[in-house]
Each structure stands twice: as C-alpha cells, then as structure tokens.
C-alpha cells in the first residue's frame, strides 16, 4: 500500500489499514509528515515530478496506491493503473476531480445535477464574455488548483483583468508557462455549505449524514454532524451526492478500475433552500474528521475497508451519538515560524465528551493546521462550544 501524501487524514487511514494487516509506505514532499510517523516505510519526493514518481513506483511496486493530495503527476498514475496497480478510488476519478472543467461537465451536463451558472474560458477575452453571460458578481477559478488558490470574487467588469492574472498565478504548475483555462460562475446567494461523505465499496454506494461546516478564507475551521436541516434537505443532499459518486464510479469501472473509497461531496445550500453541487474530493474530507466522534466507523475506517474490497453497509455509517445530540470538530491552526509545542493538554481534555488529535507536524511557517478538537453535545451550539473550549484551553508555543 503506497500513500501519495502523508498528512493528518492519511495518517488516520494508514492506522486503520494497518489494523487490518496492510503494509504501508507513506510518501510526501518532506520527511516526518504525520502518516510517515506510523507507516512501515516512508519516502520524500516531488510527487508532481513525473520522473520522481515513476521511480518511486518502480522501487515500491505497490499493489494499491492511495492518493491523499492533488499535486500528483496524474499521467504517471494512469500508466501505473493501466499496468495493473489499484489506484484509490481510480486514476480516472483522480484526474476528473482535479479538473473543474471535466468534473462540472460530468456533474451538470451528463448527470443533470444542479449547479451555479458557469462558463469556461481559455483567454482573457473569453473570460470577459463568460462573466458577462453569468452576470456579476461572479467567481473566477483556475480549472486546476486547490485550497482556494487562484480564486477571486469579481463584482464588476473592471476587475476581470485582475481575476485572470490571479487565476494564472494560483493555478497548479503555474511555473510551467502554459495558460490555464478558468471557470467563471455566478456568485450564488449562499446560506451554508454541506459535505456529504459518500462511500463506494464492493457492496455498492452509501451516504453518511450531512456535515455542516464553517470556513475562513476557504479553509475548514469547524464541522458538525448531523447538520441541522429543514425537513427533506438531508435526503436531497444525499441524493445529489449519491448521483455524483455513481457517475464517477461508472467512469472508473468503464476503465477497468474499482472506484472504491470515500468521497467528500461538497454542496451549496442557497437562501431559497435549493441545493447545488459544487465539487468532489475523491478521498476523506477534512470536515469529515468529526466522524471520529460521531459514527460507527470514521471516514478513515470506511476508506480503509472500502479500499480492501470489504463491504460497507448503512450500519457502518450510522451515527452512534445519543439521539438528538451533535458531534463537532474544531481545527486548531497555529501561526508562527518554528517548531510547535502543546501543553495544558490535561486541562483541554477536562471537559466531558471531548477528545483531541495532535498531528505532530514537525514545524509551522506562517499558518498551519496542527490539531483538531472533537466534542459531543446536546445541540450543534453545545458541541461547537465544547470543541472550542478544548482548543482554547491548550497552550501552544512556537520556537
């Protein structure tokens, strides 16, 4: 089992796989990444470099490859899948989900899922025309980027040139010189966002209870499950997620791959109550860390079992918290430059119904997610407050 990316989510998946007897090698761009600390072996390399990635595959000869990040040479991944390695969930799905154009065409134009109005553009002139068609305000993104890089909100035609420049500078492989296509989409009247974890396994596709979330600057800060929703919203959200994953898995199986694993389906809930498809992460989702406190099996255990061909049923994704209660997670983001030390852990965990995961990342330069607090409460507000108390009680030193 070879992990491409060895962050905190990969660490939890690696642990679950090792509990089931798997041998794990964890690769990342640096040594000492969280999953490398628990794996049998590790490697450090530039996974977006085709030659380095091919050399890694030639050395390890993995049976199963688990991509945990997006910055991967997908052509090499596809070649290895064609040669017989199992890519999770598939090389084809990884390529589609990295490309907003391919994913949006599949979701809206092939599967008929509701989305914001959008256009694609390969030049500044096409972007101007597309923005005029979808209307202002609108959002401009590179078709290939992650974590909000290259994204901007455009409120008038005067800002289009700057948005084009931002997209080109923030796209994946921006130093390679090619011009990136962009997507421009209408800025929806957003009320909130949901994640629906959806599992494809040898037993078919099942969905988890929707997860609510709060973001800052495009990054996850809190999540809670089950999300508080009006009647019928949860099933509508789960139906959209199931349809999206069914479409992706069909592509994988047509290419001779399994399509097994956990998918994080991201949805928009608008002020009028309608639900729109946004994107899919073909791996465990950061908002899904809350499942370590809420479900029969966490998203990491679900991913591990699905990867190994074990069946996942509705019982495995059921909530195990008391009826009417809510679980919450709170990301602990550290700012500074140097090594990080956590103290006052006992005080942080003094609140009943709470837990903590410290990721043991070696250092921070700027801002970095270093831990997550977990809590179960009688309501969404109670659970979120308890998780926040855990985070606030920690003393964090950067040296």
UniProtKB/Swiss-Prot annotation:
Judged by the first EC level, this protein's enzyme class is ligase
EC number(s) from the headed UniProt entry: 6.3.1.21
Gene Ontology cellular-component terms for this entry are: cytosol
Q: Where does N(1)-(5-phospho-beta-D-ribosyl)glycinamide bind?
A: 8-9, 68, 286, 361, 368-369
Alphabetized, the UniProt keywords read:
ATP-binding, Ligase, Magnesium, Metal-binding, Nucleotide-binding, Purine biosynthesis
Q: Quote the pathway field.
A: Purine metabolism; IMP biosynthesis via de novo pathway; N(2)-formyl-N(1)-(5-phospho-D-ribosyl)glycinamide from N(1)-(5-phospho-D-ribosyl)glycinamide (formate route): step 1/1
Instruction: List, in alphabetical order, the GO biological process terms annotated in this UniProt record.
Output: 'de novo' IMP biosynthetic process
Query: Which residues does the record give as Mg(2+) binding sites?
Result: 266, 279
Name the PROSITE patterns on file: ATP_GRASP
Q: How does it assemble?
A: Homodimer.
The protein here is known as Formate-dependent phosphoribosylglycinamide formyltransferase
């Amino acid at each position: 089992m070879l992990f491409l990316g060895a962050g905190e989510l990969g660490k939890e998946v690696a642990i679950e796989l090792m509990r089931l007897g798997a041998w794990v090698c964890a690769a990342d761009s640096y040594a000492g990444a969280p999953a490398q600390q628990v794996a049998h072996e590790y490697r450090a390399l530039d996974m977006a470099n085709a030659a380095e990635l091919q050399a890694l595959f030639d050395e390890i000869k993995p049976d199963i490859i688990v991509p945990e990040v997006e910055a991967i040479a997908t052509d090499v991944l596809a070649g290895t899948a064609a040669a017989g390695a199992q890519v999770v969930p598939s090389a084809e799905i990884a390529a589609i989900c990295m490309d907003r154009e391919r994913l949006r065409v599949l979701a809206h134009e092939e599967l008929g899922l509701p989305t914001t109005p959008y256009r694609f553009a390969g030049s500044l002139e096409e972007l101007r025309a597309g923005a005029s068609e979808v209307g202002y305000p609108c959002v401009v993104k590179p078709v290939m980027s992650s974590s909000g890089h290259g994204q901007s909100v455009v409120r008038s035609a005067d800002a289009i040139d700057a948005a084009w420049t931002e997209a080109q500078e923030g796209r994946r492989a921006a130093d390679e010189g090619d011009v990136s296509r962009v997507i421009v989409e209408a800025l929806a009247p957003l009320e909130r966002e949901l994640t629906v974890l959806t599992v494809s396994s040898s037993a078919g596709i099942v969905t988890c209870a929707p997860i609510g979330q709060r973001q800052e600057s495009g990054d996850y800060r809190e999540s809670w499950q089950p999300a508080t929703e009006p009647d019928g919203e949860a099933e509508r959200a789960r139906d959209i997620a199931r349809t999206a994953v069914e479409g992706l898995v069909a592509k994988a199986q047509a290419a001779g791959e399994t399509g097994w694993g956990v998918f994080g389906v991201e949805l928009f809930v608008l002020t009028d109550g309608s639900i729109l498809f946004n994107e899919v992460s073909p791996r465990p989702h950061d908002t899904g860390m809350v499942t370590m406190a809420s479900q029969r099996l966490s998203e990491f255990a679900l991913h591990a079992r699905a990867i190994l061909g074990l069946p996942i049923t509705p019982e495995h994704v059921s909530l195990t918290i008391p009826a009417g209660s809510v679980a919450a997670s709170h990301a602990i983001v550290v700012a500074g430059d140097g090594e990080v030390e956590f103290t006052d852990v006992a005080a942080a965990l003094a609140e009943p119904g709470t837990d903590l995961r410290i990721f043991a990342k070696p250092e921070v330069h700027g801002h970095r997610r270093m831990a997550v607090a977990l809590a179960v409460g009688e309501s969404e507000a109670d659970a979120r407050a308890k998780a926040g108390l855990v985070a606030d009680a920690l003393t964090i030193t950067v040296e």
